[in-house]
């Protein structure tokens, strides 16, 4: 009730009755009008003193009990009527103090409008950033305050303006990749798949994948990329639907996140660090100490104890997907010797004859690699869902 009554009569309180504030305000206004070329430091000092005094008056006023402030309000209302100039100045001061109280969160808008029923008055505003050290009024903003002002400005203006549709967001290629049948030449070009290597690094075996040359860079034919990508997606979907093991390989910096998401979608595996020589051709020495277990068609462990022959049996992936075949040539050679089919992104400096299902495209850009990898992972995810749905029907 105390805050409610005080807020309801806050606008009626005439601060012109305070001689010190009136004198300070008039002296500051007259000084600024009579001396247009006044020193800036003197003006800042006068403004700081005025703001400090106003702030102290507001804080002391917010702590005055209701029993003491109501008689003062009644006396103020019972006094003689103010002149037109005084009423105008009082209205301007009331608006100023109201805006100041709202800006500094001394009171909320409902309290000032007389809509709040809170019984206590807050002496200090609630700080959402308790570790923030505010700067003085006559000092420039600190780096923390500038950051918060920019953050507040971004929050207020981020949704302004026109709504843009049909925009390509590269970060969605990892988590929300498109289906293979929804891929178009425009989407491939947006991801930068058409950009090949420099003409000086060209490998002649990729001649059939090249559309042309532009400023010393080969341009890949995206029509062929689209065809090869859909074929590779069918292979990934078929292997995943049959319960095969898919191994994703990418050893360049920044590819790990995409490999993780692809392995999760297909229940496969990935290698994001150096390829260990002999992983496929000498697996008994490389992976002999790894623990093995049996899983059913739903990829759930059966908890059955394996015999020594089953434990020593070599386990190979049913499909190897390579993102950067130029650096992982040894992995492709091991897959050929182990008769493991491979899928790889073939740039204009790569060798397509080492890959079972090549995909012509840019293997240097993370945007391009994540796009192609996301499409393959989405195809594998659909194959996995088909397998699980078929098993649940039985």
Swiss-Prot record:
In terms of Pfam families, this protein maps to:
Ribosomal_S2
A Gene Ontology annotation in the biological process aspect, one of them, is: mitochondrial translation
SS bond partners: none
Q: Principal place where this protein is found?
A: mitochondrion
Tell me one GO molecular function of this protein: structural constituent of ribosome
Task: Show the PROSITE patterns listed in the entry.
Answer: RIBOSOMAL_S2_1, RIBOSOMAL_S2_2
Q: What does the UniProt entry say about where the protein is found?
A: Mitochondrion
The UniProt entry, under Gene3D superfamilies, shows: Glucose-6-phosphate isomerase like protein, domain 1
Recorded GO cellular component terms are: mitochondrial inner membrane; mitochondrial small ribosomal subunit; mitochondrion
Domain of life, source organism: Eukaryota
The record's InterPro entries line, in alphabetical order, gives:
Ribosomal_uS2, Ribosomal_uS2_bac/mit/plastid, Ribosomal_uS2_CS, Ribosomal_uS2_flav_dom_sf
Which controlled-vocabulary keywords does the entry list?
Answer: Mitochondrion, Ribonucleoprotein, Ribosomal protein, Transit peptide
Work out whether the entry's keyword set contains Ribonucleoprotein. Answer: yes
Instruction: Indicate whether Cell inner membrane appears among the record's keywords.
Output: no
The organelle transit peptide extends over 1-25
Family to which this protein belongs: Belongs to the universal ribosomal protein uS2 family.
Other remarks on record?
A: Present with 6890 molecules/cell in log phase SD medium.
**What function does the entry list?**
Component of the mitochondrial ribosome (mitoribosome), a dedicated translation machinery responsible for the synthesis of mitochondrial genome-encoded proteins, including at least some of the essential transmembrane subunits of the mitochondrial respiratory chain. The mitoribosomes are attached to the mitochondrial inner membrane and translation products are cotranslationally integrated into the membrane.
**PANTHER family assigned:** 30S RIBOSOMAL PROTEIN S2 PROKARYOTIC AND ORGANELLAR, SMALL RIBOSOMAL SUBUNIT PROTEIN US2M
Q: What quaternary arrangement does the UniProt entry report?
A: Component of the mitochondrial small ribosomal subunit (mt-SSU). Mature yeast 74S mitochondrial ribosomes consist of a small (37S) and a large (54S) subunit. The 37S small subunit contains a 15S ribosomal RNA (15S mt-rRNA) and 34 different proteins. The 54S large subunit contains a 21S rRNA (21S mt-rRNA) and 46 different proteins.
Q: What is this protein called?
A: Small ribosomal subunit protein uS2m
Q: Which organism is it from?
A: Saccharomyces cerevisiae (strain ATCC 204508 / S288c)
